[in-house]
A protein has these predicted regions:
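Beta-hairpin "wing" of winged helix-turn-helix
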Residues: 62-72
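Conserved segment of winged-helix/HTH DNA-binding domains
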Residues: 78-102
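Short, hydrophobic-biased segments on the C-terminal half of alpha helices
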Residues: 56-57
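Alpha-helical residues within the helix-turn-helix
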Residues: 43, 60-61
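Short, polar loop motifs at secondary-structure junctions
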Residues: 172-180
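Phosphate-binding/catalytic loops
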Residues: 179-229
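N-terminal helix-turn-helix DNA-binding core of bacterial DNA-binding proteins
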Residues: 10-51, 77-84
């Protein structure tokens, strides 16, 4: 008699089959750390555009990868892993040495990067900071209310990149415009929609939910004590 496998066992077996190709594993490994445009992925992996498009298409059709339009350059798309799609298959990619500090960057340093740094403080002992490419005069009121609702550490005043970044920082952009304005600056990119554009509480809740999920996923994947210098 054939064994009657559970739905979850069948799901994980199918995922292992999809990830049997080294190129797809490499794509998933990179996206586990950072959202990326197809051109960024191709450059990192050395894959021809048609071959990359094939593998991304397979991953997208099976609900592992999603595409979305940039909030900055509307001609540009970003690829990201679908939350929970790879649960149970151990496909998070290799760990990395802990940096001296994690710095979150957005354009105005008034919402997303502030919330990301505050969320990071709650789950990781690694030092953190936030900055903006064009800092606003003050933190968005919606971000302050969201931080209070979720009992996050107090948010700081908006600061510019030049006043914050030092050698050894691990930079994560949480804003498409900032990522595109300073190519090569960030070690990682999270394409988080700008809640200030909508301005309502739901927008800030959605942004913070995505940030908290990604912070919780990233923090334990740094290994060892923080590096210095």
């Amino acid at each position: 008699m054939d064994a009657e496998w559970s739905a979850d066992t069948r799901r994980r077996a199918a995922l292992h089959g999809l990830l049997a190709d080294p190129a797809r594993v490499a794509i998933v490994d990179l996206l586990a750390w950072s959202d990326a445009s197809p051109s960024e992925l191709g450059a990192r992996l050395g894959l021809a555009s048609n071959l990359l498009a094939h593998h991304v298409g397979v991953l997208a059709r099976h609900g592992i990868v999603r595409r979305h339009r940039s909030e900055g350059d509307r001609r540009r798309t970003y690829l990201a892993l679908v939350p929970g799609a790879l649960d149970g298959v151990g496909a998070a990619g290799p760990a990395r040495p802990a940096p001296s500090r994690v710095v979150f960057v957005c354009t105005a340093n008034s919402a997303r990067s502030q919330l990301a740094a505050a969320a990071w403080q709650r789950v990781s002992p690694l030092p953190t900071a936030s900055a903006g490419t064009h800092p606003a005069e003050r933190v968005a009121s919606g971000a302050l209310r969201a931080a209070r609702r979720h009992r996050l550490p107090p948010l700081g005043e908006p600061r510019s990149l030049g006043d914050v970044l030092v050698d050894g920082d691990y930079v994560i952009t949480v804003c498409d415009r900032a990522h595109e304005e300073a190519p090569g600056l960030a070690a990682g990119h999270w394409s988080v929609p700008d809640p200030v554009r909508r301005g309502d509480e739901d927008a800030f809740e959605a942004a913070l939910a995505q940030i908290e999920r990604r912070v919780a996923d990233l923090a334990p994947r740094f290994t060892g004590p923080a590096t210095t210098g």
